[in-house]
Amino acid sequence: MASQVLVYPPYVYQTQSSAFCSVKKLKVEPSGCVFQERTYPQIHVNGRNFGNSHPSTKGSAFQTKIPFTKPRGHSFSLQAGAIVVKDTAGATKVLAAQAQQAGVEAPRAVVWRNRLHFLEGPQRCGLKRKSEELENHSGAMQIVDELSILPAMLQTNMGNPVTVVTATTGSKQNCTSGEGDYQLVQHEVLCSMKNTYEVLDFLGRGTFGQVVKCWKRGTNEIVAIKILKNHPSYARQGQIEVSILARLSTENADEYNFVRAYECFQHRNHTCLVFEMLEQNLYDFLKQNKFSPLPLKVIRPVLQQVATALKKLKSLGLIHADLKPENIMLVDPVRQPYRVKVIDFGSASHVSKTVCSTYLQSRYYRAPEIILGLPFCEAIDMWSLGCVIAELFLGWPLYPGALEYDQIRYISQTQGLPGEQLLNVGTKSTRFFCRETDMSHSGWRLKTLEEHEAETGMKSKEARKYIFNSLDDIVHVNTVMDLEGGDLLAEKADRREFVNLLKKMLLIDADLRITPIETLNHPFVNMKHLLDFPHSNHVKSCFHIMDICKSPSSCETNNHSKMSLLRPVASNGTAALAANFTKVGTLRSQALTTSAHSVVHHGIPLQAGTAQFGCGDAFHQTLIICPPAIQGIPAAHGKPTSYSIRVDNTVPLVTQAPAVQPLQIRPGVLSQQTWSGRTQQMLIPAWQQVTPMAPAAATLTSEGMAGSQRLGDWGKMIPHSNHYNSVMPPPLLTNQITLSAPQPISVGIAHVVWPQPATTKKNKLCQNRSNSLQNTNIPHSAFISPKIISGKEVEEVSCVDTQDNHTSEGEAGTCREASVRQDSSVSDKQRQTIIIADSPSPAVSVITISSDSDDEETSPRPSLRECKGSLDCEACQSTLNIDRMCSLSSPDSTLSTSSSGQSSPSPCKRPNSMSDDEQESGCETVDGSPTSDSSGHDSPFAENSFVEDAHQNTELGTCAGPEAKPAVGTAVEPPVGRESGLSVDEHMANTDSTCQPLRKGQPAPGKLHQPPALGARQQKPAAAFPQQHLNLSQVQHFGTGHQEWNGNFGHRRQQAYIPTSVTSNPFTLSHGSPNHTAVHAHLAGSTHLGGQPTLLPYPSSASLSSAAPVAHLLASPCTSRPMLQHPTYNISHPSGIVHQVPVGINPRLLPSPTIHQTQYKPIFPPHSYIAASPAYTGFPLSPTKLSQYPYM
């Protein structure tokens, strides 16, 4: 009997670097060689004996290149003698061994497959069905099951119930292979009852079918369609997958981080599932980066999101049963870094329908209860997740067993033997363990390699890169050597919590294993342990990254296309609140088109010729209102993160325009902005040496349109996380400002907007936060792709040692000076994308890490402080976007050896990367002491870019000391809550001001026009507490999100405080934050008079003396200045502590438009490097715990 198989072009089989569901690693348990490939899957021949017990060295002979010269649709008859092979999750493939012509001449056709290694033995290889079912090709066509009871979302099949139909070999249609796979042709049309999809590309072959990339006709949507096989052995599991997806379709896929299913339909007797298109799975991402370890700050959001998905699955009684890096997808690395979703529910089942002795999960991530044949539940997913995060941390699988014996052997050697009660109950315990009979007490022991080989004929071979005697030793792997001070302490504390959580996730006893909800409450995830390091830039970066990943639907409304930046400030997802704008002149400005990739806000245009922001920014930044005298962008970032940034004139930020018509803006009009609980705020994009970039087509809009749209819709509210139920906009500008009408003004939203998705789902994370204040609006920001990165940003990333092949912060710091002097043409040369081929990873050197600590270094520390600047430098030439990123691990590290040139194949070739003569070679012993690790400085996630800012640590204080002087500035606290239900206390900063000259006509700070409670609090500030756990004022360039993934972190920008005279009116805040259930006494006043400031104390400049480079920016205690309101930023500590970093600003550096600069005398002599221009600093936009707040 012959099958009709379509021959289709080679593009269908292109190796996928980004796919919804990439080709899966095969679960192979062969004889003779235990190594398998992941990129080039090993194939286990089922039911055939080729007399070859070793990997075939001629596997490539099966990769026949077919010149596709025949018209589409021509078929060829293939002999029935096909080779049946099995993939990882049980899917079968048919290799055409011989081809015959069928009516037309055609070249010999051999269906493309990955490199094959034929091995004998009828091993089931963890498959969910038996091989005998494969060969049951007799019988009539039959309907296996009907799935008529489905939600409306999935009942879209041409009016008929979903049927899984199978056909015999002799009667199957010519579009279906012998194993039930649908044979696709490019541009084939798949029709559901509602939509039509055109096949664009082949994405991957999975457990129960294949996945293709399709275009939804009539729209601009790209979807992924999973076409299930119609083989009878897959019918039941396909039905289960459809039913599970139907159940999940009623949940919020964005909130719970699993892939969204759109519809289900039938196409030629194949069930087709339509999913949202995702970008890249974690395994492909690791592979692109040569399996470099990821930093904990990047692992944490992945863990948090997957644990959230498992929490939901557990609540529904579902088991995913195939969690692995291949099934965790990056949603959109460009616009949503760190956002992941769980895919592939083809192996999922309900917990009540589990059967013991069932093979589930991929072997590397298979739980002990599955290996031993014990009853199992959702806890197997937690084991898999533990193995996944360990692999992300190590860059290599923790337990890469090629055989189940190897898998349980690795587990037992590191974590000890399973409990006797487990071995007694396990149905498969005797396969790997044997009872001791010559002992006084009966017990179990692991079979030796020789015993197992004698029984099974399979020879084990070491596949681990790291051999741990205990999971505690993981803490010493890939130690970051470039951190110091608070950053180093924070990293060590983070590692301890990570290992603590990992041990709980990898408990052999499933009953004791940590649950998803407990995981989410673990200190490693909620970062409570990092609150003890408020000045650490590592901590700030950790909080910042977690803020990003907690916005699941942030980009849905803008992820399809970038729109013109000149648009109404009011966004669709915001509440329709009217803004009190009267007597506001029109604005004349020019729209920056999308081709310029500007990062200004939607409603904040730039002039033509000033679009220097040709930088691929993963999220959109906004600008402050810059007085005409202030120009430039920062040229260096090596300053303490809590203070103002200096500005150079090298690259103008806002150019002046001739005054045509003054624009009168009422005081406080632009001040009613919301604080983002999601991300850090910013005022100016702080790229260094931005290449000038004019807009492609800048159009001059009419005054009426620009003015009415921008200002008329200003002030609407953005929904945020349900951590807060109120929005507290602080005053931004509290005095009148006169601007020229044609001059482009960059208004300081200082806010990254995370709107709700367009589709209405229940239980959103981003719920509307009620606001009883004046009607305000914050517009969406344009999503900018980081694939176009400014020269300055590239230079920050490009400080890479060619030998080390990874970016360290020390290098970035060294290159900072030189990068300022380079012209933009040099920067442009460094913006070429580097495509990294699937090069193998380093030699698989087995490193035994014992818990016995020695205090000796195993290798000298190479120099990390300079960049060669040559064209050979990988990172210097790359934009390092997240989906095409250089590998930045060191070749000379004994632990991070994953990118050396002579390396062995990476885990994609995972256990069988070494030849037989290489086995057991390269073993090294690394002591378990922290000092013995020699690869920390080579770790690809060394974040020394924040080392310069690590010298701000001061002692934490408690509220005490009634003798403090009145503050020299004002501060208001915006909310930055992390955990719901946390009590919040506050520690005010102790100020050391010795004299407070008052400006004429203004009251003394903290004394006049102050409520009694506030005045008392002002007179009794706490001890010096100028620290914070996470300063959202310090804003990182989002375009460097890919650097975070690869362990290279760009500098963070800071926000500017705008000093202005205060004209304020009282208003009432409706505060519903769980962190702030009570109003503090110092903020409880309700009798603020208009025009009078609410003052909170600032720390003295002495307490910030460690920040010498910005001493000129600190508040001068003896200098006259206007009374400012500087909102400060705080972190809600679980124990009820709020850490603040109020910042004093020398008004000389930022003159108010209504106050002349000569009225201020800086206490410090001017420095040559700041004399270029005035500077402005950043500030958060929303206070916290306020019942009355003056504005306007």
From Swiss-Prot:
Entry EC number(s):
2.7.11.1
Tell me what effect the entry lists for K226S.
Impairs catalytic activity
Q: Which SMART domains match?
A: S_TKc
Its main subcellular localisation, reduced to a broad class, is cytoplasm
Location of region: Disordered: 799-829, 889-943, 956-1023
Q: Which Gene3D superfamilies match?
A: Phosphorylase Kinase, domain 1, Transferase(Phosphotransferase) domain 1
Classification of source organism: Eukaryota, Metazoa, Chordata, Craniata, Vertebrata
Annotated region described as SUMO interaction motifs (SIM), given as residue ranges? 843-895
Q: What is the gene name? A: Hipk3
Tissues where this protein is expressed: Heart, skeletal muscle, spleen, testis and lung.
Give its localization. Cytoplasm; Nucleus
Region described as Interaction with FAS: 775-868
Q: Which GO terms of type biological process are on file?
A: apoptotic process; negative regulation of JUN kinase activity; negative regulation of transcription by RNA polymerase II; peptidyl-serine phosphorylation; peptidyl-threonine phosphorylation; positive regulation of DNA binding; protein phosphorylation
Q: What is this protein called?
A: Homeodomain-interacting protein kinase 3
Q: Which keywords, in A-to-Z order, does the entry hold?
A: Apoptosis, ATP-binding, Cytoplasm, Isopeptide bond, Kinase, Nucleotide-binding, Nucleus, Phosphoprotein, Serine/threonine-protein kinase, Transcription, Transcription regulation, Transferase, Ubl conjugation
